[in-house]
Design a protein with these regions (language model features):
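Conserved functional hotspots at enzyme active or ligand-binding sites that engage polyanionic ligands
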Residues: 1-115
Length: 115
């Protein structure tokens, strides 16, 4: 499990207004923590949900083109929906952000969290 991977993640049990169901999400927690959680089979990783609704892309979101990240359709990463999820909810890799988009997502997270 590596930072920048797009994986299918079970986001069920989300409250109204939050991204829910099984959907793509970008792993944004650090690789060291991700490796430990994966090895132990427990713990949490931090993810940013992805949606294919790209009608509007706000400054705290990042446009992900299908060709560039390896997913089925153009989408956006929603930094405003960042959350920690159990490793039990993490599914297979379906894409990967190049370094340029990881940097943009880092900036979107900084903007959203006012860091």
């Amino acid at each position: 499990m590596l930072r920048g991977e797009i994986r299918l993640v079970d986001l069920e049990s989300a409250l109204a207004g939050a991204a829910d169901k099984r959907r793509p999400a970008v792993i944004v927690s650090n690789d060291r923590a991700n490796t430990v959680a994966a090895r132990l089979g427990r713990g949490v990783v931090t993810v940013v949900p992805v949606t294919s609704n790209t009608a509007r892309v706000f400054p705290f979101q990042v446009l992900l083109t299908a060709d560039e990240v390896g997913i089925r359709s153009d989408s956006k990463a929603q930094a405003e929906q960042v959350r920690a999820v159990s490793v039990d909810r993490i599914g297979p890799v379906i894409g990967r952000l190049p370094a340029r988009l990881v940097a943009q997502l880092d900036e979107a997270l900084r903007l959203h969290l006012q860091l």
